[in-house]
Every structure is written in C-alpha cells, then in structure tokens.
Amino acid sequence: LRKRIRLHQVRVGMFVEELEGTALDPAKPHGRFLIKSSLDLDRMMASHAISVVIDTQKGIDTDTAFPPEGLNPAAFQAHLHSFFSGEQIALAQRAIEETRPYVRNVLVQAQLHHAFQFDSACLAVEKVMSDAMSTTSALIGVAKLKDKDEGTFLHSLAVSALMITFGRNLGLNEEKIRLLGLGGLVHDLGKMVLPVELLRKPGKLTADELALVRTHPQRGYEMLKKEPYVSNAVLEICLSHHEKFDGSGYPHGLAGNDIPLVARIAAICDVYEALTTVRPYKRAWTQAEAIDTMIHSTGHFDPDLLKAFVSRMVISGTIH
C-alpha cells in the first residue's frame, strides 16, 4: 500500500518507493529502498524532498498510536508504554522525583526572594546528565503529562533534558552540554516574579499583559547575573530564547547568527516541549503536528538547527 508522508515523518524500517520534489543525486538516496539506519535518515534529510512515498506492506507505517480526535492523558500513557518498558518509565519517574526538591528550591527562591539558587540548579542538571540516554528520553515523555500546579517545574525539567539530549546528538562536549542543561532549567526563571494569575490566564492576553509577560527574559537575566558563577551561555539562553531567526522576536530583535547558538537551540526545545505538552483540559499536539508547525514557522528558528533536531531527535526516535 503506497502512502505519501512528509519528510520528517520518515523512520528506520520504512520502505521508500519514491522521493518527491528533489533532483536525483548519486550521493543521495533515490529509487526504492529500505531505511536501515540513522545514516540513511541523515541522507534522507539531505535530499530536501517535499514528500516521500512509502510502501506500508514492505516496511513499517507512520505512527498511529494517537487517536485523530486528540491527545488525552490516558492515550498518551498508552503511547509511552508502546515505546518504553515499564522499567524505563519507572526510572524516569524516579529521576523526576529526585530532581524535584532541587528544581522547586530554584523556583521558590526566585519567586519569593528574586534570587537564583545556583547549587540546587547544578544538582538537578547533574542528575539528568547522569541518567542513561533511554531514561532521559523517557523522562522527556513522562514530563509531558502536566497539571496546573506542576507545569512550571516539569516544563523547566523537560526543556533541560531536551537540550542535554540535543547537545549530545550534536556532538558537543560535556561542559557545553552541562551549560545547555542549566540554561534550559532556568530559561523561564523570570516568569517566577510575574503574577501567577497572569501566567494561568485561560483567555487571550491584552496588549499590556502580553508586554508584561515579554519582560520575563530580561527579569530572569537580571536575576541570574547577580550570581558570579553563572556562565555567559546560561545568561544568553535566559535572555535570548524568544529571539527569532528573522529578527521578529524579543527582547532585542536579534536576527540570524547574532542570536547566540545556545539560545537558538533553546528556542527549538522550548517551543517543541510546549506544543507537545499533555494537559487534562487542553488537547496536545502530536509530535508530527508540532514538527510540521515548526517547519512551516518561517523565520522563527535557525533552519539548520531545526533540520538537525528533526533528523537526530525526532526521525531517529530519540524522543517520542
């Protein structure tokens, strides 16, 4: 059975019948073939095909774990168990519980005293970095299930884990990966000094409310820079993770490579995690929907980094 899919939906185990919208190149895959490895996936991404025709009788189909009517917590739990063993999920849940006191201390101290607990943040990041890759991948999935009281904690932890995992897949050294994890953990620290009712407002924000929310990168940056041990990379993530590649972001309207690399990485991980969050009161987006939206958000993300995220994190099956 032939089926047309988007390039980012391709997985190892699929049988490709045809690449559409790309010139044939001997150095790139074309014709009919089975995708056997991550190297094949990288070559597929390099083809820049508009769409891919697969044969679902000769290879695997696209993910159909989610019902078309949307994602709810029960459906997502079943989805997790289709990718991770009960032991991996239990290890991920334990990792979340072990980091909870450290991350909560960071958030509470920021909220009550406008201060950054550097030691607590470092302990949380070390815990995530010490876990096996499979546990970290499961943690990213488990952390998508959020209620209103756990949202900030789990989002901060999940973005940190995403940035650590992406950094490893980009081949960065351990110190740079550690800084990515720390930056991911505190990227929204400035929100802790904003009114809670504003952050939880269900409807559309007024212009004044939106302007206030958009002060959180600068507020977080001011809080972090009081701590002498915080590196420039962490400060850059906090201050610039809402900048957009075309210059339309905030707070400073930076564009292209003027946006620090670490902040461009953070922008991708932050948006992906937010889009795929599963809440009891809100339909979450599937991974395919989130990636499709991000790919078509022209000007928002560094296109090369986004391509790497899709290839090395999504298509490779590192995250689900």
For every predicted segment, state its role:
Residues 1-116:
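Membrane-cytosol interface segments
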Residues 29, 179-180, 262, 294:
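Alpha-helical hydrophobic/aromatic positions enriched in membrane-embedded helices and signal peptides
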Residues 33-34, 170, 203, 228, ...:
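Helix-turn-helix-type domain boundary/helix-start signal
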Residues 44, 201-223, 244-320:
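Divalent-cation-assisted or electrostatically stabilized phosphate/pyrophosphate-binding catalytic cores
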Residues 183-194, 233-242, 261-265, 281-283:
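A glycine-rich, aromatic-flanked flexible loop/lid motif
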